[in-house]
């Protein structure tokens, strides 16, 4: 079993093109959709309208996976956050003291979902699957920073090809594909300031929804006698932290493109599983 963990953004789509061109030896790509109500709508549109047709035209399997509950129903990150009576905070919210919270979203909705798929298709400790992750050369410090499960062997083919993130637009354009948006949940607390500013300016309805989610989380926290949490690093409600007309000062590299999200918090979380 040999699969590429596809995240929907720059590196993943560059890898898809390289595979179609015979430069990357992967013919099965797995996209973990963490929820139609959770993924950025622009990412879902790109995957369905561009990536999947391109993959099919070049004999590549691009499977869309979702997390299922024991009763067979689909579970989403947004659904877990907003479920009646839920105390779960699977996303890395900022605590009231500024510290990042722990999270389980990547492990539960991506790593375990891909793990289940490869095991269903024959992966085991005796015959582990090769799972490729789209980390580019400029992100080499992110490679090998999570525990490898017995049923898998992690691979970083973009490193072998010495592909940098800045190379991805040219690779994608060479296939006649438009540039994909940066991939992440629309409410992800790892968004940098620029992403929130762009959302408020370009997609105000989505920004308002993020503010509403923050309100819901804090209403529940208040009922439980707990401190507030925030979706940004500014220690105040999103609608106050991001003002209308605010300028983007620095390039925003916030994304969840490698198919998995990797941060120090995730490394610690993985070793607690």
Language-model features, listed with the residues they occupy:
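Nucleotide-activated chemistry modules centered on ATP-dependent adenylation/adenylyltransferase
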Residues: 1-273
């Amino acid at each position: 079993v040999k699969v590429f963990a596809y995240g929907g953004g720059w590196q993943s789509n560059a890898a898809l093109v390289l595979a179609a061109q015979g430069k990357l030896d992967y013919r099965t790509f797995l996209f973990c959709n963490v929820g139609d109500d959770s993924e950025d709508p622009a990412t879902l549109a790109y995957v369905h309208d561009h990536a999947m047709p391109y993959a099919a035209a070049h004999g590549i399997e691009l499977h869309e996976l979702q997390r299922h509950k024991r009763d067979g129903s689909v579970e989403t990150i947004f659904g877990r956050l907003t479920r009646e009576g839920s105390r779960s905070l699977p996303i890395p919210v900022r605590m009231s003291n500024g510290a990042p919270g722990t999270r389980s979203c990547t492990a539960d909705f991506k790593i375990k979902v891909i793990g289940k798929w490869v095991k269903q298709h024959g992966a085991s400790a005796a015959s582990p699957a090769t799972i490729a992750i789209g980390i580019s050369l400029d992100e080499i410090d992110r490679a090998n920073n999570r525990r490898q499960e017995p049923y898998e062997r992690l691979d970083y083919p973009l490193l072998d090809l010495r592909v940098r993130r800045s190379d991805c637009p040219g690779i994608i354009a060479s296939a006649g594909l438009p540039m994909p948006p940066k991939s992440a949940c629309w409410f992800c607390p790892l968004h940098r300031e620029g992403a929130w500013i762009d959302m408020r300016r370009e997609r105000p309805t989505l920004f308002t929804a993020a503010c509403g989610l923050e309100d819901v989380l804090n209403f529940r926290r208040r009922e439980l006698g707990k401190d507030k949490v925030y979706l940004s690093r500014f220690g105040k409600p999103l609608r106050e932290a991001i003002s209308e007309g605010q300028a983007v000062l620095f390039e925003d590299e916030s994304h969840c493109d490698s198919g998995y999200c990797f941060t120090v918090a995730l490394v610690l979380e993985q070793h607690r599983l």
